[in-house]
């Protein structure tokens, strides 16, 4: 689907259907074969470049040749939880400047109006590109904040319940943070390259100052992602060690109980309840209400002595 936008009083306004294909700003989402042919013809795009833009694994980069500027950056998708797996993908967003026209291409269904209709004033297509880079950086920052809060909540749940579900979600969150850090590093390098070549790419001084602010925000966001990723990795390792230590302590207690019960089970197994009843009737002549409590007391004393022996042997 292709949607056109025109400039009006420092803002972008959606163009009519008749003017969509000739608008200075075009947005193409999930292009079909006909739209791909239109893009290749009107913006002189090769099939390889178009496939690179639509590839979600493509690294952020910029190309400037043949009077055409191609920018590929990363943009975060919506965060969701599917079967205890945190889904936070990163998509590729392509921008092409050719003959005073700007084309955005992406292979996902997302609302792009928040990028174009932001409070920032836009006078030409390069202002629009700067605005999109700025909004992408802010979007990453908001996602990092949400993921940090989710990490803290999952840590508390792991401590309280020690459930494998929460731990798997923590692993999934750590994987997403790794993808985010990689995407932010690529975007930061892209913005740095645009800033260092503003005159060559046709940006004016005011736009360069705006790019400088975006560059600082991107570097800060990139550093925040790296710090959060490092903390999450170390905290995840610590949680795993803590859970392993808890399991080891539990197994130690169960082993101690089994060892203490072993002599008692041995005595009860050799004698047996039926044999003890016959032995009591023939030799002790005591009522069962007296003989069995004495037997249980004896077994308890044996267990207590076993416990004390283990203590002296430094096994407890």
Positions of PLM-derived features:
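Long amphipathic alpha-helical coiled-coil segments
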Residues: 194-206, 232-243
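Short helix-coil transition/hinge motifs at the ends and kinks of transmembrane helices
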Residues: 80-85, 201-205, 277-285
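Hydrophobic alpha-helical transmembrane segments and their immediately adjacent juxtamembrane loops
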Residues: 44, 216-316
């Amino acid at each position: 689907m292709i949607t056109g936008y025109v400039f009006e009083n420092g803002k972008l306004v959606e163009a009519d259907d008749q003017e969509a294909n000739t608008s200075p700003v075009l947005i193409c989402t999930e292009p079909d074969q006909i739209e791909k042919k239109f893009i290749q013809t009107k913006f002189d795009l090769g099939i390889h470049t178009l496939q690179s833009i639509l590839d979600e694994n493509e690294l952020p980069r910029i190309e400037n040749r043949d009077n055409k500027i191609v920018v590929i950056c990363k943009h975060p998708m919506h965060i969701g939880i599917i079967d205890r797996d945190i889904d936070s993908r990163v998509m590729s967003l392509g921008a092409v400047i050719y003959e005073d026209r700007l084309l955005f291409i992406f292979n996902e269904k997302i609302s792009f109006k928040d990028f174009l209709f932001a409070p920032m004033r836009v006078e030409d297509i390069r202002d629009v590109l700067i605005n999109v880079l700025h909004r992408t950086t802010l979007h990453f920052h908001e996602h990092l904040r949400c993921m940090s809060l989710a990490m803290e909540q999952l840590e508390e749940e792991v401590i309280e319940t020690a459930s494998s579900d929460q731990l798997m979600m923590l692993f999934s969150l750590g994987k997403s943070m790794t993808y985010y850090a990689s995407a932010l590093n690529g975007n930061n390098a892209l913005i740095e390259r645009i800033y260092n070549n503003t005159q060559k790419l046709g940006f004016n001084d005011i736009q360069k100052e705006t790019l400088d602010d975006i560059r600082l925000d991107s570097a800060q966001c990139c550093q925040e992602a790296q710090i959060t990723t490092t903390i999450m990795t170390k905290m995840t390792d610590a949680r795993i060690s803590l859970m392993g230590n808890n399991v080891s302590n539990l197994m130690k207690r169960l082993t101690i109980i089994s060892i203490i019960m072993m002599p008692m089970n041995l005595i009860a197994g050799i004698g047996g309840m039926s044999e003890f009843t016959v032995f009591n009737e023939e030799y002790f002549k005591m009522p069962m209400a007296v003989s069995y409590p004495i037997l249980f007391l004896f077994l308890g004393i044996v267990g207590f002595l076993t416990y004390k022996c283990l203590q002296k042997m430094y096994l407890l």
